[in-house]
Amino acid sequence: MIGFYATQLRLLSRWTGGRAGVVRRGVATIVIAMLALVVTAWLIPGITLRDVPSAIVAALALAAMRTLLRPVLIAYVSHISIAVATILTVLAQALAFWLISRVEWIAVDRPEDALVGSLLFSIVNAIVTAMLSTGDDNSFFGTLVRQLAARHRKRDVTREPGVVFIQIDGLAQPILEGHLRAGRCPNLGRWLRSGGMTLNSWKPLLPTQTSASQAGLLHGNDDGIPGFRWWDKKTQRLMVSNHPKDAREIQRRVSSGDGLLAKSGASIGNLLSGDAPRSFLTAATLDDPAREIRRSHVLDWFFISPYSYIRWTLLSVGEVIKELVQARAAARTTSPGPRAFPYPLARAATNVLLRHLSTALVIEEMWRRTSPIYVDFVDYDEIAHHSGPDRVEARDAVAGLDKIIGIIAKAAADGPRPYRFVVLSDHGQSPGAMFADRYGKPLEALIQELAGKQVRVQGATAHVEHWGRISPLLSEASGINGMTRTLTSAPFRHHAGARDDAKEPPDIVVAASGNLAHISFPGMSGRAAMDSIDAAYPGLVDGLVRHPGIGLVMVRVNGRGPVVHGGGGTHDLTEGDIKGVDPLTRFEPTAADGLRRLDAMAECGDVVIVSMFDAASGEVAPFEEQIGSHGGLGGTQGDAFIVHPTEWGIDAPPVGAVTLHKQIRRWVRPAS
């Protein structure tokens, strides 16, 4: 038991800043206990404080009891539930109240007063402690580390290093390099300056979005994912990558059963699981009880512990207020992005709840000695969609994630296994005002005009990523099933642009992924060629090609294969013939390969559109409701990065997620 408390004290010292931090923590604990005792005596008539010295001694006794008893309860009963440990703490405090009254430090009239007083004392203690620690992540995660040390006290130490992959969703390499130069990422900067870590670039191919990148990175197969959403002619419905049902189907198509995380890994906060045996907050496994872990110490602690619950509630409210203030300021100085409700709630969910919960789950998995671990932090990507990739709100998100990286590395040093880290992005983002704002109408309205009023056009251009990100959080928090799942699924499908399966398919479906859009004709079997489209909808393709907001249009031509139109010329992707001005000149060098790859997919739309791209400003015109976007071509959305141990070399920047997957396989196999 002496060794047990010595470990707790050592970890407390490490996470509070040494001896001085321990002293400050001790003083704060006593002061909070005194305040909680005063409030308890004030609100409960059956509890009376005799005098100031006696009250101080009573507060000291209660604080000491909580400090010494809580770790023991965590060690021995939290495997049942953190709620059991909390209940036992309250009962032990009630006994302490009664015993203290026997030595006349305080007066307690009846045993039930002691029980109610103990409960109120715990609530006040939790509220004040949570309020004081809202800005102190070290205190919060240090508490978790001490709890895990208590729970896993008999675990053997493993000397072989594990691997943790930290994905910063949507962060482009040029943006990261700007943060490093400005000193806003001190932890990553320190790793790179030490020479132990190296920053490299990699190029995601079309579509530049998470489901395709994660399919390639985690499963080594990104075929059949032409965008964030698309019309699936085989099933006659809209596929949306982050809807759990569709994510599960995507994983079924790309998985061989031997993904990057197979056999011993953990997936946290991802769209796809990489075949990990342990998954949390992962869209593809939310409905799979064999994969999605519903019970863990972290999930119990995060959603049941009063201290944790109150803390993240306060932080979430603060984040909503912060967003409302920043959105109002942005509206006065710039063209505002789409920041109306429910976005402030989505920002709180990603920037507070998902960030902290994912971090806690990573730390718990490290204490389980899991490897490899792959976690996706989505808060920067979500914020950048609405404020822009390099606005102050997005910069704050990157700085916050750098702090989280430091906390994860610090927690790894206390755990039973050493870990190596890889930090990467799945794609970047490109800035630019929405297509609808630039040209007065959304893409589906333009297509409606060109096709005719009698044509039924279904648009899927609303921003829905935050709905998909909130869904796993709600599922983990409440175990949504049955009617509740149906009720929460319905608005998601509506906002995604999905239709009721019982309804007749529309004539034209417009499915947007950033500044990429797939135009599909559900009534035309197979891939529709240009002559068939022109016959059914005269002037549609030509009208799109001539529109100033459209950078290129790819459509198959009978006898020639895919041809790219736009910018005063055409580019035959099969033969390489160019007539007039090459429409791909303004885009990145990998554009032709990316479009050929897209066309080869059976799931590709009949017509593929990419918006205009201004090479001077780096701006695109997203078809979705975003001012920072990805999914298509143009700008920094195609500039991803990877920070890795220097000895894990890369000969040349990988092109495509599958290529990077193969490189990572060579690193991870011996490491895990």
Describe the predicted segments one by one.
Residues 1-116, 120, 124-136:
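Juxtamembrane/disordered regions of integral membrane proteins
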Residues 137-139, 220-388, 482-485, 511-521, ...:
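His/Asp/Glu-rich, glycine-adjacent segments
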Residues 157-177, 191, 217, 372-378, ...:
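Beta-strand elements within well-structured catalytic alpha/beta cores of enzymes
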Residues 190-200, 403-405, 420, 427-478:
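Catalytic or ion-translocation cores adjacent to nucleophile or general acid/base/metal-coordination motifs
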